[in-house]
Structures are given as structure tokens and as C-alpha cells.
């Protein structure tokens, strides 16, 4: 059975939607965990405060209680790469952080997601609350799972999206995690990456060159104005890059609803569905697709369009520049998961390999979409 952690927008209707979907997919798939944070603690999280909900402690406590009564665990995100902007500022706020952790534990928060190991050190001085390592930390080696588990008692990891199609890494990581009672979680609908066309006309793409810089900006920007400065750096750059060619999107590290079985086959059944700043309508749309392992439509609608962050447009109303019929991608991931697999990070995209380009040319550009 597939299990899901879902982004929480703190809408009461989201809990109702989860309850209905859990009943609909009972025995096959279940949402078991929510994740999110609030604007008053923007210094701790990987999202600027203007994108986060604001609420008082009474509301938060009531929401956690309702979720807990439904059997949902709440995961509070303290996943800033550098909380408070520097090590010294972080140290200056150490007691404040620790007091907040103790309060979160008191009201029923089950787990905290971190991206900075120093946060684990602070938390472990006062609490044995469950911890998760964020995908922002980009765990790049199998042995890192062991280190974080043994040193800090961390029992859950969101896998680096760079590794989403690395069969050998995932197989070995899943083996270690399953043998040691650790949850290995895959971020399903993340399309981060950059792309271009070289001087010879070869289109290429790669894991996002802006990713760490992006999360530093998220963590330190305070207002929408700050986020939009310097041509909406960095998101303005990666958005335009991905739209350079249709096949750029195929080169990103997404996992379709239908592809989950490939991960099940190597021992992974826990998936993260992002979108905590999205609408309940959008989150319900995403949950239904993944829990049902079936999706009809444009692949790109599985990800919250970055453009909607600043425009306020509803996700499902957004007009994408590229249409990639999801069902045309059946079998697409076989290149990475059949036989010995394929590791894009070890090759020059567009030169050593043109698989995505050829696939797009054959199945996408010529489809009736």
C-alpha cells in the first residue's frame, strides 16, 4: 500500500478531502502525514513568510488535534538551509527554537523536518521528537543515511530529487532504510531543473543549477517585492529555461502516479506530494491522481505552476505553454529502471544521450493533444 505525506494549507476543507480520499482508496493508498509551517516562524522554514498562512496558537492547536483524531501525523517544517540567516543568529535564537519545539511536541506535532544539521543538534538537546531530513539537504550517498540515523536518531528521509531515477542508489538506500526501520520518502511531483540549447542545436537539461541558491532566497526573502527582485531570481530563470523545449520537462525528476509501482518494486512505498501553498482544490486533484495511480491530462498540471505564486491564479486554471499528455509517458521511465538502469548525472545530456529528445519527437510532438 502506498502512503503519502501531503502539503498542508491549513484549510479545514483539506482535512475533509483527505478523509474522503482515504475512505475511497482504503486498502490501496492512504494519506498518513501532513507537513507545513506558519508565517510567524518564517525564519525556520524554506518558504518566505508572504507565502505562508498566518494563524494564532489556538487555531494551530485545534488543527493539529483534528488531524491527529483522524489518524494523521503532523510534520512541522523547519527546513531552512540557514535559519535566521547565519550561524551566529541561529545560536542567538537557540532557546527560542528549543522552546518552540517543546511546545510543538506538547500540542501533538509528531515530526519536524530539518535541512540544517545544526537544527538537529539544537532539537536533540531538548527532545526526542521524530525528525526528517528534507530533500533540500540532498542526501547524495547511501552512507549519509547511516550517519544521520546513528548520530541524530533520524528515522525518515526525503530523497534528493537528483536521485529519483538512480536505480542503484535507490535500491541500496531502500535496503538500508527498510532494514533499520527508516522511512525513505520520494518527492513525486517536483519539476525543478534548468535547460538550454547548445551552439550545435542540441537541447539539454539537468538537475537545477539554482536549487541551493533558490532555497537560500526562499529562506531569507521576507516580502513579495524581495522575491521578485533581479528579474524574479532565481525562479524566473529556471522557469524560462525549462520552457525552452518540450523535452526539457521530460528530463526533470518527476514521478507520475502510474510510475509509483517502479519504486514499489525496489522497496519504496512512501511519497511526498508538494503544494502546501496551493489551494485545497489543487491538493485534492493531486492526491486523487496519486492515490488512484492514474492520471489523464497534461503532465505539467501535477506540479503547482510557479507562475501562480506571484499572480494568485488558481493552479488548475493556469494555461501551460507546453502540453505533455501523461498517458503518452507509459514506459518512459523504463530506461532508468529496467536492467542496470541509467544515471543521467554521469553523462552529458543532449550529447551522450538523446533519449528524451527522441521520445518527445516520436510520442509527444506527434500526438493528438
Identify the residue ranges that each predicted region occupies.
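Active-site pocket-lining/capping segments in soluble small-molecule metabolic enzymes
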Residues: 1-147, 154-272, 276-369
Amino acid at each position: 500500500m502506498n502512503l503519502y505525506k501531503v502539503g498542508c494549507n491549513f484549510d479545514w476543507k483539506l482535512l475533509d478531502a483527505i478523509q474522503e480520499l482515504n475512505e475511497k482508496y482504503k486498502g490501496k493508498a492512504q494519506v498518513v502525514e501532513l507537513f507545513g509551517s506558519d508565517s510567524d516562524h518564517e525564519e525556520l522554514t524554506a518558504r518566505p513568510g508572504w507565502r505562508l498562512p498566518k494563524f494564532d496558537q489556538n487555531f494551530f492547536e485545534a488543527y493539529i488535534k483534528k488531524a491527529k483524531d483522524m489518524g494523521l501525523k503532523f510534520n512541522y517544517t523547519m527546513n531552512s538551509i540557514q535559519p535566521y540567516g547565519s550561524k551566529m543568529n541561529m545560536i542567538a535564537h537557540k532557546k527560542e527554537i528549543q522552546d518552540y519545539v517543546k511546545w510543538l511536541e506538547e500540542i501533538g506535532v509528531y515530526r519536524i523536518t530539518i535541512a540544517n544539521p545544526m537544527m538537529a543538534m539544537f532539537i536533540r538537546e531538548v527532545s526526542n521528537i521524530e525528525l526528517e531530513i528534507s530533500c533540500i539537504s540532498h542526501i547524495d550517498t547511501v552512507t549519509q543515511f547511516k550517519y544521520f540515523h546513528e548520530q541524530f536518531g533520524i528515522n525518515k528521509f526525503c530523497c534528493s530529487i537528483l536521485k529519483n531515477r538512480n536505480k542503484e542508489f535507490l535500491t541500496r538506500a531502500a535496503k538500508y532504510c527498510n532494514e533499520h526501520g527508516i522511512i525513505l520518502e520520494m518527492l513525486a511531483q517536483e519539476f525543478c531543473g534548468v535547460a538550454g540549447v547548445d551552439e550545435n542545436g542540441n537541447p539539454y537539461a539537468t538537475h537545477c543549477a539554482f536549487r541551493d541558491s533558490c532555497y537560500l532566497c526562499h529562506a531569507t526573502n521576507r516580502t513579495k517585492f524581495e522575491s521578485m527582485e533581479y528579474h524574479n531570481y532565481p525562479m524566473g530563470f529556471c522557469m524560462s529555461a525549462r520552457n525552452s523545449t518540450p523535452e526539457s520537462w521530460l528530463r526533470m525528476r518527476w514521478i507520475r502516479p502510474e510510475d509509483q509501482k517502479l519504486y514499489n518494486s525496489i522497496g519504496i512505498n512512501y511519497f511526498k506530494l508538494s503544494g502546501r501553498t496551493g489551494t485545497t482544490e489543487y491538493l485534492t486533484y493531486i492526491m486523487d491522481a496519486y492515490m488512484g495511480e492514474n492520471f489523464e491530462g497534461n503532465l505539467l498540471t501535477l506540479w503547482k505552476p510557479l507562475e501562480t505564486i506571484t499572480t494568485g491564479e488558481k493552479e488548475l486554471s493556469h494555461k501551460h505553454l507546453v502540453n505533455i499528455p501523461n498517458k503518452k509517458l507509459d514506459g518512459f521511465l523504463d530506461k532508468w529502471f529496467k536492467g542496470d538502469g541509467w544515471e543521467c548525472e554521469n553523462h552529458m545530456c543532449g550529447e551522450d544521450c538523446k533519449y528524451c529528445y527522441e521520445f518527445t519527437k516520436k510520442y509527444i510532438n506527434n500526438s493528438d493533444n
